[in-house]
């Protein structure tokens, strides 16, 4: 006997009524508003029960079988969010996912109530999955099946998109539809940013006592490693970026000696690499390293650092998800442009209470694709002139989009991320 994938809304209502999943609950007597726990998987206080609703949907929908499939929390979470976002009867009312004490999201039904979505028949068939049907959603499926909707682009379509990038003007346009260009024919070009085989390009700038002494652009599998001028371990991953000997640029011998001492403690170096939507860092030597997000011209030295790069494990230093959300808000005029420049202070504490130029070794790392995205947003909102932007990642091509299309592609990119 065949099985049918349960409908997300009747299934979710059933879970809410049962009240067995931690933090998943109705918020009003009319059963129109409910909350879902939304803790990030990388938080140190994350527990298995924080993600029970995502795993439950993965099991019910047949995407995950315990004991057979490998657990994949980001995919479970992304699929659950995408399933809810596709339902017009539901909307995100409040987003508290970044609340440090109780991260959650509040959804509400915009129809007359949950009576429009009867609970499923939760009897199990031989496979152990739910067998259910829903008249309301079945009618929607029939309506959609009669429309000419292109399927998602596969590998062949993606190849075509890379060989023939869209040539559209980057300008505000009332005539342009607010959707990614020809998504049925070619993949959203911005999704290259998350591709496992596409490496970001980084511009590395080194300062000794506030003086720029070095700049290099790096694009390499495995990311990069900031290493001292002495010989380093070539067996480690990441392209080594060798910081120059201070004697070539500093006239003060005493300062040069101190800088050289910092470089000698770098050991295997400071590793920086991308995995999915995150940039990760780890120090492989004895030299302590502090980091913070700042402007391209100067670090945010008037405040505390965002953190210290860990030695015994990797630490996240940048999340593309909030950056894209802030970029959309910037395009809409509701906030300033998001920051994307990483500053690292090596061998000394972060310059919180004094000028950053007093520090011996400061390194600035700019992900060039993020600079391109911000430049694209600025140009699209400030000018009607055509502009072509290179994302500065491997296998990328010059990209041109209208302002509306660009914003829609950014929103589409957010759907593929884990929050």
From Swiss-Prot:
**Which PROSITE patterns would you find in this protein's record?**
IRF_1, IRF_2
Please indicate which residues carry the site annotation Cleavage. 121-122, 125-126
PTM note = Constitutively phosphorylated on many Ser/Thr residues. Activated following phosphorylation by TBK1 and IKBKE. Innate adapter proteins, such as MAVS, STING1 or TICAM1, are first activated by viral RNA, cytosolic DNA, and bacterial lipopolysaccharide (LPS), respectively, leading to activation of the kinases TBK1 and IKBKE. These kinases then phosphorylate the adapter proteins on the pLxIS motif, leading to recruitment of IRF3, thereby licensing IRF3 for phosphorylation by TBK1.
Q: Quote a single Gene Ontology cellular component term.
A: nucleus
Q: Where is this region: Disordered?
A: 118-137
Alphabetically ordered keywords of this record: Acetylation, Activator, Antiviral defense, Cytoplasm, Disulfide bond, DNA-binding, Host-virus interaction, Immunity, Innate immunity, Isopeptide bond, Mitochondrion, Nucleus, Phosphoprotein, Transcription, Transcription regulation, Ubl conjugation
Q: What is its main location?
A: cytoplasm
| N6-acetyllysine modified-residue sites | 364
Record PTM Diphosphoserine, positions in chain: 384
Please name every pair of cysteines joined by a disulfide bond in this record.
Answer: 265-287
Q: Which domain of life is it from?
A: Eukaryota
Instruction: Please provide, alphabetically and separated by semicolons, the GO molecular function terms listed in this UniProt record.
Output: DNA-binding transcription factor activity, RNA polymerase II-specific; RNA polymerase II cis-regulatory region sequence-specific DNA binding
Q: Which positions does the record annotate as the modified residue Phosphoserine?
A: 14, 97, 123, 383-384, 394, 396
Mind telling me which SMART domains this protein's record contains?
Answer: IRF, IRF-3
Q: Which SUPFAM superfamilies match?
A: SMAD/FHA domain, Winged helix' DNA-binding domain
Residues annotated as DNA-binding are: 5-111
Q: Region Interaction with HERC5: start and end of each range?
A: 198-358
Regulation of activity is described as:
In the absence of viral infection, maintained as a monomer in an autoinhibited state. Phosphorylation by TBK1 and IKBKE disrupts this autoinhibition leading to the liberation of the DNA-binding and dimerization activities and its nuclear localization where it can activate type I IFN and ISG genes. Phosphorylation and activation follow the following steps: innate adapter proteins, such as MAVS, STING1 or TICAM1, are first activated by viral RNA, cytosolic DNA and bacterial lipopolysaccharide (LPS), respectively, leading to activation of the kinases TBK1 and IKBKE.
Region entry Mediates interaction with ZDHHC11: which residue ranges? 140-419
Q: Could you tell me at which residue positions the Glycyl lysine isopeptide (Lys-Gly) (interchain with G-Cter in ISG15) crosslink is annotated in this chain?
A: 191, 358, 364
What is an annotated GO biological process for this record, any one? positive regulation of interferon-beta production
- Spell out the InterPro entries in the cross-references: Interferon_reg_fac_CS, Interferon_reg_fact_DNA-bd_dom, Interferon_reg_factor-3, SMAD-like_dom_sf, SMAD_FHA_dom_sf, WH-like_DNA-bd_sf, WH_DNA-bd_sf
What protein name applies here?
Interferon regulatory factor 3
Specify the species: Sus scrofa
- As recorded in Swiss-Prot or TrEMBL, the protein's gene is named IRF3
